[in-house]
Amino acid sequence: GKWMWWSRGIGGKSALDYLIKVRGMDFVEAVQTIMGNGSASYPTYENSNSYEQQPLLLPERSPTSDVVVEYLFGRGIDYEIINECLDKELIIESLPYHNVVFIGYDENKEPKYAAYRATNQSRIMGDCTGSKKQYSFRLTAENTGEVHLFECAIDLLSYATLLKLDGKDWRQFNLVSLSGVYSPKQKIEDSKVPVTLSRLLEKDKTIRRIVLHLD
């Protein structure tokens, strides 16, 4: 909420402002503190799992995307957004089970992350072998000054749909999936900053605002 340091004549509208202006933290340190429930100690970075050191193994691709389109549209995702993600190969349909696969790329446009999700009634989902979470699924825009974080790709696409329904251009928003639920531990020193977020802040120094869309 809002705060004011009367003796210094400075104030702000968020905890992020307070930690930077009053506690003297830099932006990344302030974000780490907030993500860890506000403790002054800093969490460690999330280390990659051993399977992430392997090359990314993408599933066989279906020649059509009919099942994936029907599934995502049934989840309320806008048809235009679905098609654009398909055109950019951010989403593919796999064989033999016709799962939806969400793909993340590195700076060279090489696929480095992939998460699959069943398109039927089952709850089968997970990361493909070799997935590197720092390149998680995202819809990016440059020089926005902010980033919106989501637990999963479906949540991200749902928000993009809501932006469009609200008359906003969803392509002008920086939307990033954390590729899983983030839950800081009671002891902040045992918590880990999501590697997706830490890499994002290292690479894009223009980001000054982080919007959390977490369950």
Q: What are the functions of these language-model segments?
A:
Residues 146-209:
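Acidic, glycine-rich catalytic loops of TOPRIM or P-loop NTPase phosphate-binding modules used
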